[in-house]
A protein has these predicted regions:
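Gly/Thr-rich phosphate-binding loop signature of adenosyl cofactor/nucleotide-binding cores
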Residues: 1-82
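Structural motif
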Residues: 54-57, 87-90, 112-113, 153-155, ...
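Fold-independent oxyanion-binding glycine-rich loops
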Residues: 59-61, 93-94, 118, 150-152, ...
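Hydrophobic/aromatic ligand-binding patch that stacks against planar heteroaromatic rings
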Residues: 80, 106, 170-171
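Charged, amphipathic alpha-helical linker segments immediately N-terminal to NTP-binding catalytic cores
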Residues: 85-90, 94-131
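P-loop NTPase nucleotide-binding/switch module
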Residues: 131-151
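Short beta-strand-centered segment that lines the nucleotide-binding/catalytic pocket of NTP-utilizing
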Residues: 137, 174-185
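Glycine-rich phosphate-binding P-loop
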Residues: 151-179
Length: 185
């Protein structure tokens, strides 16, 4: 069992997001952990416990906080965030919130993808976490046959040629379902 990652291309295909800026092709930028982060405390200057491997979600609270800062303080706060080089910074509610111009400038400067979504922060976070949990879930591939018998999954394992597939065929004839044969992930 190895570690898995998911590309930003997969995420933008499956979750409602569009690209504002990307330093390279979306399929070359990978996310390795299933957690996301709202960087409100980080933007306010509290830098402890910040995980730069997480996607950074900018919602209404973060954007309103930044709009209340002077241009110099806003640039400084955003520079601190983009300097961490997270996989991407995503601005939610893009119909009412537009990324600050300095966000695109800093994304280019630090090589960080900048995305936006029309979804609310909670909806986007739920969708992202769901896709990330599915794509990054630990898994192994086993040689065998997977069948569903009376609603329960049963994995039939054994040496090659002992009749695993024949057993599965008999179960299917009796109304049960074949899920996978040969290589089961």
């Amino acid at each position: 069992m190895g570690t898995f990652n998911v590309s930003l291309k997969t995420l933008t295909d499956r979750v409602s997001m569009e690209v504002v800026y990307t330093p390279k092709e979306l399929d070359q930028i990978c996310v390795e952990i299933a957690e996301v982060n709202r960087p409100g405390l980080f933007l306010a200057g509290y830098y402890d416990y910040f995980d730069k491997l997480r996607l950074q979600i900018m919602g209404l609270a973060e954007m309103n906080f930044l709009s209340g800062l002077s241009p110099e303080k806003r640039y400084e706060a955003l520079d601190q965030l983009f300097r961490q080089q997270p996989p991407a910074v995503i601005v939610c509610r893009s119909e009412e919130l537009t990324p600050f111009p300095e966000m695109q400038e800093l994304a280019q400067k630090h090589g960080v993808a900048l995305l936006r979504s029309n979804e609310t922060t909670c909806t986007l976070m739920g969708s992202l976490i769901s896709v990330l949990n599915l794509e990054l879930a630990p898994r192994i591939t086993r040689h065998g046959v997977l069948v569903e018998v009376y609603g329960e999954g049963i994995l039939i394992l054994g040496d090659s040629g002992i009749g695993k597939s024949e057993l599965a065929i008999e179960l299917v004839k009796r109304g049960h379902r074949l899920v996978a044969d040969d290589a089961v992930e």
